[in-house]
Amino acid sequence: MNTPTTGSHPARYPSAAAGEPTLDSWQEPPHNRWAFAHLGEMVPSAAVSRRPVNAPGHALARLGAIAAQLPDLEQRLEQTYTDAFLVLRGTEVVAEYYRAGFAPDDRHLLMSVSKSLCGTVVGALVDEGRIDPAQPVTEYVPELAGSVYDGPSVLQVLDMQISIDYNEDYVDPASEVQTHGRSAGWRTRATGDPADTYEFLTTLRGDGSTGEFQYCSANTDVLAWIVERVTGLRYVEALSTYLWAKLDADRDATITVDTTGFGFAHGGVSCTARDLARVGRMMLDGGVAPGGRVVSEDWVRRVLAGGSHEAMTDKGFTNTFPDGSYTRQWWCTGNERGNVSGIGIHGQNLWLDPLTDSVIVKLSSWPDPDTEHWHRLQNGILLDVSRALDAV
């Protein structure tokens, strides 16, 4: 990446002392402002290795020409609790912003943008013929026989078109997503919780119907289990081998792991904004990274084309993007720009703008995990910056 020179931003970034986070509070404000950048100090984590590269250091870019088009951009970034923001056009960083106390080489938790990384690894294995998307999940993981995954295909898991008894309420301690997190070590385990992620996945039930979208974080961890089974690698090793080592990343990524060493594929990856932008660059380059091909052009084409709009039931998404869909672990807007995004709670975005050959990364620490208010503000920024790029 080629980056122009600039200065810094004065906004205050809270310290650990301001929050004193615990295992049960680190995801909540104000603790999350610190914890999202220091997750390895809260939850056991493993390195997702990059390959050694001899790359020059990068100077920090400013908001520059983008700010000329959007004079209130920095204010909007501050209002939406932005920790890191980056715009990559082609191979040039044309805009970059970091809150005071957060540096370009700091990692940030991606939350569910991690899902898009997992989907990409699955795509690489589909290209190799090691995973057949049409095959049932239990062809690869027979331990899931008798669960809700006994019958659905790998593609239905990728596209989240399975009816599952899984409440994705991030603030309800009785919800399945909270039990999932406790089993993975993200919170203190309660009496009766499954011992680890593998065991948790085998407990999931549902009516067995398919074809209608239901967002469910467990699906991604099932995909990671399939990845482990067909490669013989731990998921963290597969993520390195099939994606991260090919990006010429500045730093290793990290991923949280449970007591068995299973990587929290659906939400546990942390990396720098610049390295996440490299993932987007690879997608816009047809699946090719500096270290070699990651996924086929056909896989990328299918992601950028979007999935089944008829299957989409997420009104929060379609209220903003009426033609939106979800496919292969990516959110597809269906808008005139063809924007596609990896999205994570608390304001994480990896946004692709094919019209301008640009990638936008926004990493944040919203005080609420997942509300229409914050998504509306966030999507407004991403769309306005995309349109501003037309004139840059």
UniProtKB/Swiss-Prot annotation:
InterPro entries: Beta-lactam-related, Beta-lactam/transpept-like, Diverse_Enzym_Activities. It is an enzyme of class 3 (hydrolase). Residues 1-27 are annotated as: Disordered. The keyword Hydrolase applies. GO terms for molecular function: 6-aminohexanoate-dimer hydrolase activity. GO terms for biological process: nylon catabolic process. The active site is at 112. Keywords: Hydrolase, Nylon degradation, Plasmid. It catalyses: [N-(6-aminohexanoyl)](n) + H2O = [N-(6-aminohexanoyl)](n-1) + 6-aminohexanoate; N-(6-aminohexanoyl)-6-aminohexanoate + H2O = 2 6-aminohexanoate. Pathway: Xenobiotic degradation; nylon-6 oligomer degradation. Its EC number is 3.5.1.46. SUPFAM superfamilies: beta-lactamase/transpeptidase-like. The EII enzyme is 100 times more active toward the substrate than the EII' enzyme. Involved in nylon oligomer degradation. This is 6-aminohexanoate-dimer hydrolase. It comes from Paenarthrobacter ureafaciens.
